[in-house]
């Protein structure tokens, strides 16, 4: 649970009370805002074989953080939205009773979502590795100067960009930063990544969809000291000229509990409508 959400402690108490009615055993842990770490994570690691699923109370950022800990252990996540849009959440707070009843009856599905692996190579040595559900982003940082970089797919040269950066997104991440930068929306069942340049200095640049069994390599030609690789907007690493960023499919997938009989396109309509109301 994200402790920074005011509704969180109240909702948590309700869940704990209801869980006793359904003979569930719940263990309370927090995702800490900022560090996005799990308190007493060693204790969780020792007992992961006994965990059937994880309830995550928070916004999309909290869920993104949770996937990094629980996806490698193949533990499903049920998201309960305490944020604004809640695109990754399955339930709103008022649907807790409905959710627990469905879980108790075994009336749910587990949906797999592709995760990505991003590695940084410097002077032929690997210097960083990150995993994420949404995207890996090369960005220029605070100064208004462009980055020059080349993109390769499975060692096949694609093109060279002069741009503010580039986004490599999973289907899940295609509705996030990549969408704002002009990228297409991918159905989660599509086995692909989308490569979307950020403000490219050309009229011809477009986003590119590639199969997710391909390896994407970004070679940085010129960059500022503030240039960064960020993954899911929560992990970051400084990038220098000559660095290579290698992005491919992670060796595991995130697992999400699905309780409602709604398609991806229905969810997309609902969330985009909510986003429009929020911005209005």
From Swiss-Prot:
InterPro entries (alphabetical): ATP-NAD_kinase_N, ATP-NAD_kinase_PpnK-typ_C, NAD/diacylglycerol_kinase_sf, NADK
Compartments, record wording: Cytoplasm
Enzyme Commission numbers on file: 2.7.1.23
Reactions performed catalytically: NAD(+) + ATP = ADP + NADP(+) + H(+)
Tree of life domain: Bacteria
Cofactor(s) demanded: a divalent metal cation
UniProt KW keywords: ATP-binding, Cytoplasm, Kinase, NAD, NADP, Nucleotide-binding, Transferase
One of the record's GO cellular component terms: cytoplasm
GO BP: any one term: NADP biosynthetic process
Entry keyword NAD: yes
Active site feature: 60 (proton acceptor)
Disulfide bond annotation, renumbered to this chain: none
GO molecular function terms attached to this record: ATP binding; metal ion binding; NAD binding; NAD+ kinase activity
Binding site for NAD(+): 60-61, 134-135, 145, 164, 175-180, 234
Pfam families cross-referenced by the UniProt entry: NAD_kinase (PF01513), NAD_kinase_C (PF20143)
Top-level enzyme category: transferase
Main location: cytoplasm
Function: Involved in the regulation of the intracellular balance of NAD and NADP, and is a key enzyme in the biosynthesis of NADP. Catalyzes specifically the phosphorylation on 2'-hydroxyl of the adenosine moiety of NAD to yield NADP.
Family membership: Belongs to the NAD kinase family.
Name of the protein in question: NAD kinase
Annotated organism of origin: Carboxydothermus hydrogenoformans (strain ATCC BAA-161 / DSM 6008 / Z-2901)
Source organism phylogeny: Bacteria, Bacillati, Bacillota, Clostridia, Thermoanaerobacterales
């Amino acid at each position: 649970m994200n402790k920074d959400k005011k509704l969180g402690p109240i909702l948590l108490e309700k869940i704990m009370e209801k869980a006793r009615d359904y003979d569930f055993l719940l263990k309370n842990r927090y995702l800490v805002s900022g560090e996005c770490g799990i308190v007493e994570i060693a204790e969780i690691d020792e007992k992961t074989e006994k965990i059937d699923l994880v309830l995550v109370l928070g916004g999309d950022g909290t869920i993104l953080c949770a996937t990094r800990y629980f996806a490698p252990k193949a533990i499903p996540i049920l998201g309960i939205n305490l944020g604004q849009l809640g695109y990754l959440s399955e339930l709103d707070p008022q649907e807790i009773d409905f959710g627990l009843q469905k879980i108790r009856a075994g009336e749910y599905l587990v949906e797999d979502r592709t995760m990505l692996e991003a590695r940084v190579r410097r002077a032929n040595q690997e210097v960083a590795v990150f995993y994420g559900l949404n995207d890996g982003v090369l960005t220029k940082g605070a100064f208004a100067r462009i980055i020059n970089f080349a993109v390769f797919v499975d060692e096949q040269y694609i093109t060279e960009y002069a741009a503010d950066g580039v986004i490599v997104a999973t289907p899940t991440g295609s509705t996030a930063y990549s969408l704002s930068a002009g990228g297409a929306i991918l159905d989660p069942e599509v086995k692909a990544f989308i490569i979307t340049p950020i403000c490219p200095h050309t009229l011809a640049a477009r986003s590119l969809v590639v199969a997710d069994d391909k390896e994407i390599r970004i070679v940085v030609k010129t960059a500022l000291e503030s240039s960064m690789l960020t993954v899911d907007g929560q992990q970051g690493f400084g990038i220098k000229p000559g660095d290579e960023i290698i992005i491919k499919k992670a060796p595991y997938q995130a697992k999400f509990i699905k309780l409602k009989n709604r398609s991806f396109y229905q969810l997309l309509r609902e969330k985009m409508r909510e986003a429009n109301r929020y911005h209005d």
